[in-house]
Amino acid sequence: MAKLISYAKGGFLRNTRLTSRAVPQVYQHATSSRGFVHLTSSVAQSSAIHVSTPSTPSLMLIMGKRTMFIQTQDTPNPESLKFLPGVEVLGKGNTYDFPSVAAAHCSPLAKLLFRVEGVRSVFFGSDFITISKEEAAEWGLIKPEVFAVIMDFFASGLPILHEARNNADTEILEDDDETVMMIKELLDTRIRPTVQEDGGDIVFMSYDNGVVKLKMQGSCSSCPSSIVTLKNGVQNMLQFYIPEVESVEQVFDEADKMADKEFERFERNLKQKDTSSTAPVGIGGGPAN
């Protein structure tokens, strides 16, 4: 997401209007720290974990045992982490968001990942899996379990999704006017790939009276900088090429709203506990008068 902001501020926008496929080139640079973990599947009766290097093949067969090199990559959201298994997950350009365990009914892999304690949400990309954790959870405890789940699942040969599904939000429809078509084109060809590099996705919801409504997914859904990304990155880019766009707004679905309510309730309970623990205690253990 930081790439979109720096791109909009860095003067990389060409002084041309967006037509058909005339879209801006995104300035890309490596900003994320990466880790490599070599796992030997427990299906192959081994649980060895070794440090690997970027040049090591992602998937190989050694002495009849299936091994996988899983790469981890930080995201702008400290509560989200990308896992790159070195093999295709959903295929180029495809994503699937699982904001809660209830949404994982169509994916055996997502169900298994939600069983890992501390996992809050799961997101599948073309060749990566983004895990978002609870704030109190620690990556040091979550990562080994996620590694094991991914390794065992890919060794099993089970389908990742019960039903194949392509992203349809940017598909050009018969009733789309020129403005909507240009918005979808720019989102699909330049903005979405950049956001997916950060372990998330951006979904077109609607356009009406100059307002573009978008939904953030994956690491971007709860990222502290998501609003800044929308305003300083996505909105500026859309407005430059499509003057009809007046503003960009983020929308939330029911799962997002429920998660926010649960978090607010959790915070209130913590504050109440803190207040009761610091209150003066009288004789007999009751509050002092």
Swiss-Prot record:
One BP annotation, GO: iron-sulfur cluster assembly
Q: GO: which molecular function terms?
A: iron ion binding; iron-sulfur cluster binding
Domain of life from the UniProt record: Eukaryota
Q: Which Pfam families match?
A: Nfu_N, NifU
Q: In which residues is [4Fe-4S] cluster bound?
A: 220, 223
Question: Which residue ranges does the record annotate as region Disordered?
Answer: 267-289
Subcellular location, record wording: Mitochondrion
Query: Which residues make up the transit peptide?
Result: 1-56
What keywords is this UniProt entry annotated with?
Answer: Iron, Iron-sulfur, Metal-binding, Mitochondrion, Transit peptide
- Might you report a single GO cellular component term? mitochondrion
Question: Where is the segment annotated NifU?
Answer: 183-251
**InterPro entries attached to this UniProt entry:** FSCA_dom_sf, Nfu/NifU_N, Nfu/NifU_N_sf, NFU1-like, NIF_FeS_clus_asmbl_NifU_C
Q: What does this protein do?
A: Molecular scaffold for [Fe-S] cluster assembly of mitochondrial iron-sulfur proteins.
- Please name the PANTHER family in this protein's record: IRON-SULFUR CLUSTER SCAFFOLD PROTEIN NFU-RELATED, NFU1 IRON-SULFUR CLUSTER SCAFFOLD HOMOLOG, MITOCHONDRIAL
Tell me the protein's name: NFU1 iron-sulfur cluster scaffold homolog, mitochondrial
Q: What lineage is on file?
A: Eukaryota, Metazoa, Ecdysozoa, Arthropoda, Hexapoda
